[in-house]
Amino acid sequence: MSGWPRIYYKLLNLPLSILVKSKSIPADPAPELGLDTSRPIMYVLPYNSKADLLTLRAQCLAHDLPDPLEPLEIDGTLLPRYVFIHGGPRVFTYYTPKEESIKLFHDYLDLHRSNPNLDVQMVPVSVMFGRAPGREKGEVNPPLRMLNGVQKFFAVLWLGRDSFVRFSPSVSLRRMADEHGTDKTIAQKLARVARMHFARQRLAAVGPRLPARQDLFNKLLASRAIAKAVEDEARSKKISHEKAQQNAIALMEEIAANFSYEMIRLTDRILGFTWNRLYQGINVHNAERVRQLAHDGHELVYVPCHRSHMDYLLLSYVLYHQGLVPPHIAAGINLNFWPAGPIFRRLGAFFIRRTFKGNKLYSTVFREYLGELFSRGYSVEYFVEGGRSRTGRLLDPKTGTLSMTIQAMLRGGTRPITLIPIYIGYEHVMEVGTYAKELRGATKEKESLPQMLRGLSKLRNLGQGYVNFGEPMPLMTYLNQHVPDWRESIDPIEAVRPAWLTPTVNNIAADLMVRINNAGAANAMNLCCTALLASRQRSLTREQLTEQLNCYLDLMRNVPYSTDSTVPSASASELIDHALQMNKFEVEKDTIGDIIILPREQAVLMTYYRNNIAHMLVLPSLMAAIVTQHRHISRDVLMEHVNVLYPMLKAELFLRWDRDELPDVIDALANEMQRQGLITLQDDELHINPVHSRTLQLLAAGARETLQRYAITFWLLSANPSINRGTLEKESRTVAQRLSVLHGINAPEFFDKAVFSSLVLTLRDEGYISDSGDAEPAETMKVYQLLAELITSDVRLTIESATQGEG
């Protein structure tokens, strides 16, 4: 490029460099999209805009990608490095309007015909200034919105700092030429496909147009389901039809979101400023699979785990910066207080009561509203656990909203609904102190403005945040596989509850929890907490802590929990340095070196972070506990022991493996433990290696409290086979609380009601107890004896004497 075009672009770039601060999606295009910068690259843009082209250029230069303004020289032929699909106002005729884009595609394809070694990467790129979807009654935007010069000027002026450059996966022109030829019809088809691609991409980033709120309410009121519910309300409460209708509108006002793009923009500014000061980084993994689903037209339902009130904001912020539409979020009615309620509503929150029981009108209005969101194509987010986890482990799922999601499919909608499980992890959860108090019996404090301000005032260094997108679950595919005749239940008017709905929803919910855990994120805090809590004195020398972290890291890297889980790339020493900056640990220095201590008052709180990744280490911990106790054991006997205990662990921690997969996993873990020198393998026997016995013992301690809990329940069951399930849960908790006090067990979940409730249900499912409550004493005693070998003698005596004392 030379002469006037160069001067023109330099002059145009002056105001743009000040006004435009764009973000690249993905954040690092070359590695994330597999672009090979050693091969020729050309860019395809949706329409002729110099502002777009220069915005793209800035991102290309920032990410070491070829400059789009520099022509591409191939076999002595100079070709522009970019193509505009649509024409537009032009200053220089050198650059291609729409008619010439086909000719340019053809020129590129033609070069591939004459040069068999050539392979140009065609990268579609869309540049967006602002992402307001507009309102339904407004002017309809075309799928590719081309602005004239004046419109573009104001768009850049007002939205320059809310601009995104979206790079798509490249298309190999070599493959196109080989598979489809190089004539002009292929070039025309390429241009047509590119236009469709950009239209879809815009919809995925901006979302469908928003309805006027009153129009939405009128449409809901006109639906047959709500009309019938209003009649029933008037009849059952002996009120007029108008009054019943007003009740329905009041419920809609209570429930419905009031989405505002301007509020999204403002909050994005505030959150961007806040995150940069509070978080040292937000790590996002597997977002490309979600972008692809949105691009393919899927109705997305985000199903994250629930750690903190921060989840709502963090996930919407991350999705917005990944080029996706922030979802409509199901939020607890407890958050509908001033000023948070109105703000959350404008950010897409719709509010849900804790229970629907006894209010048919409410349940009908909520179900119809949710169905309307799906039918209009809005993405939705809800927390399948129902509330925030107080222990750091996943809670048993609540299936009400999930059931309504499937009922929405049974209305006969055409868009495929896909559930996206999401693991959210933090190095600091601001409510963790409150959680510990609640687990100790304190009453939950009601959410309010003063409480919110107190929470915000405590925000300091929050370390790193993690958002890992798990394996998507397309509902249509799932139902086709598990309920082949599900389409027979489709009813476009009435909400239906076929016999298969409840068991199917329960299975989907359990599968979602497994997929959330599959996307777990290990980090500096949860790894250091796991190691220090494994030590009886909650302290280790820096060398010991480094060695223990290396053990965990090697296990997770060499035998990954799943393909979706993430492990830090930093060294153990770097992770310790980072964790120490979080001010949770104390360091005592002596002449020999540093001792890292987890203070007693922090120990209870730090169990929360350990529990975030308990599922990723529990199997190697159990193996280590068995080997440590037996000193040497054959693979077959080890496998038998693991097989007995695994169903309880699987149900409690939502582990991913089926029983028939265990032998391969245990073999892989045993080989890795041998490689680390924790054990030796001789004649198919695992032997403890005295040189690294401390590391093995600390690894084993990760399963210690879980095994103690199981021992309590199996001992009670053996001592009193006819005990009913409710009493078994209650007495298990009582003994666990006693054990906690006598043996200094700091984990609040050790005597958590939900944990024992889940365990007793698993015992029923596994046949240890029947529905009538009777247990088989020989079987339960056999399991207790296995567990008794894996816990210390003083703990065993406390368990056995506690029940004898009650007798």
Swiss-Prot record:
Q: Where in the cell is it found?
A: Cell inner membrane
- Membrane topology, as annotated: Peripheral membrane protein
Its Gene Ontology cellular component terms are: plasma membrane
MF terms in GO:
glycerol-3-phosphate O-acyltransferase activity
Instruction: Provide the alphabetized UniProt keywords.
Output: Acyltransferase, Cell inner membrane, Cell membrane, Lipid biosynthesis, Lipid metabolism, Membrane, Phospholipid biosynthesis, Phospholipid metabolism, Transferase
Q: Which reaction does it catalyse?
A: sn-glycerol 3-phosphate + an acyl-CoA = a 1-acyl-sn-glycero-3-phosphate + CoA
* Top-level EC class as recorded in UniProt: transferase
- Record SMART domains: PlsC
One biological process term from GO is: fatty acid metabolic process
User: What Enzyme Commission number(s) does the record list for this chain?
Assistant: 2.3.1.15
* Residues passing through the membrane, by range: none
- Domain of life, per the record? Bacteria
What are the disulphide bonds in this sequence? none
* InterPro entries according to UniProt: GPAT/DHAPAT, GPAT/DHAPAT_C, GPAT/DHAPAT_LPLAT, GPAT_PlsB, Plipid/glycerol_acylTrfase
Q: Tell me the pathway.
A: Phospholipid metabolism; CDP-diacylglycerol biosynthesis; CDP-diacylglycerol from sn-glycerol 3-phosphate: step 1/3
- Motif (HXXXXD motif) positions are 306-311
Q: Which Pfam families match?
A: Acyltransferase, GPAT_C
> Entry's HAMAP family?
Glyc3P_acyltrans (MF_00393)
The record's section on NCBIfam families has: plsB, PRK04974.1
Share the domain note from the entry. The HXXXXD motif is essential for acyltransferase activity and may constitute the binding site for the phosphate moiety of the glycerol-3-phosphate.
Question: According to its UniProt record, which protein family does this protein belong to?
Answer: Belongs to the GPAT/DAPAT family.
Official protein name in the record:
Glycerol-3-phosphate acyltransferase
Q: Which gene is the coding source of this polypeptide chain?
A: plsB
